[in-house]
Amino acid sequence: MAQKLWEKNVQVDHEVDIFTVGKDREMDLYLAKYDVLGSMAHITMLESIGLLTKEELNVLLAELRNIYAVADRGEFIIEEGIEDVHSQVELMLTRRLGDMGKKIHSGRSRNDQVLLDLKLFTRSQIQELVELVSGLFDVLISQSNRYKDVLLPGYTHLQVAMPSSFGLWFGAYAESLVDDLQLMQAAYRICNRNPLGSAAGYGSSFPLNRQMTTDLLGFDSLDYNVVYAQMGRGKMERTVAFAMAGIAATLSKLAFDACMFNSQNFGFIKLPDQFTTGSSIMPHKKNPDVFELTRAKCNKLQGLPQQIILISNNLPSGYFRDLQIIKEVFLPAFDELKDCLRMVTHMMREVKVNEHILDDDKYSLLFSVEEVNRRVLAGMPFRDAYKQVGLDIEAGKFIPSKSVNHTHEGSIGNLCNESITAMMRSVIGSFSFERMNEAEKKLIHG
């Protein structure tokens, strides 16, 4: 068994080793590229303060770039007996470069190293989420504009209420995504601060240049206080998880609507046959399994913040091994949410709408408020108009005029999709992805 970075003369018990490493080796594969990026920035800083020579820096950077390429191709592995990604990268360096590879850990702890890895990974995942949310938003706005004049029933308490439209329905979910990205932008700002240099949580006697690594990695700023930097472990993940849960909640509600509207009892929308699944016994079935699975997956994702809270909420300041378990629920959650976003975008692009829903007389009562308002506009007090229309309905005398004239902002006749789109573009523009991408590209390519 390979010696651990922290082992001295006593080898750890085998069962203890298995239990404490847990799933960390598997989870750390998510972080491999980012561990290498962090090491590139760290050793560049070490050279600037005299802990590495220029020649050593160039040799180490070249080898780290080779390791990065391996990780970027998905070929990075953590060997048997190696407990984490940090140990594997250092092992690969020392195999190739000897004692020079052992110098990269000066002024650094695995505590701030994994904090950095998690932040670099998370901000990259946030960029992917923002791009996918933007793609879904564009589809929803396009469908809203396309079907803006097609009416459908609006419901309260699952009872027929007032006229709505597909323009409103598609557009509502588009605007919901704007708010979801507002929350994600706040989470990104917390994520995009540099913890490197906090070491084990109490800094270092080396004259580390933390601003230099902040700039090299394209962070907005630092987690200044070294104790707080370590306290941020778990807090950052929880904050991002709440933002992910917001997106998941929007998708879950949309999926529920789609399942319901697609059913025979509603018949408001229709999915292409190739987007549905069948039954092993009922030959007529065309099931909206994609939306059902999206609903379940997104409901699960809404539990992610609570999982992280329960793992971390009773810990004092400083590092504790409990925090390792957060990786197991946090890191894979991004793939699940991204898959849901891709599939919902795919489905909503192809969904067909029923343009004649309100021809059915069972929806006549939708127009009761329209009739009340018409009488009010003719001079009748609202309460009198409300009572008269109610009595007409009870007596079976209500004959609706199936027309609507809603003109205020955000209504059937005035969707304000241009304003909603402007809000989305503003939110997306507030992320500093260009700075992040440029910094990482410079580290990778020199």
UniProtKB/Swiss-Prot annotation:
NCBIfam families assigned to the protein according to its UniProt record, in alphabetical order: argH
GO process annotations (BP): arginine biosynthetic process via ornithine; L-arginine biosynthetic process
A GO term for molecular function: argininosuccinate lyase activity
Name of the gene this protein is made from: argH
Classification via Gene3D superfamilies: Fumarase/aspartase (C-terminal domain), Fumarase/aspartase (Central domain), Fumarase/aspartase (N-terminal domain)
Name listed for the protein in its UniProt record: Argininosuccinate lyase
An annotated GO cellular component: cytosol
Protein family per UniProt: Belongs to the lyase 1 family. Argininosuccinate lyase subfamily.
Keywords noted in UniProt: Amino-acid biosynthesis, Arginine biosynthesis, Cytoplasm, Lyase
Keyword Amino-acid biosynthesis (UniProt): yes
Major localization class: cytoplasm
Enzyme class: lyase
Protein's organism: Parabacteroides distasonis (strain ATCC 8503 / DSM 20701 / CIP 104284 / JCM 5825 / NCTC 11152)
Subcellular location: Cytoplasm
Pfam name, any one: Lyase_1
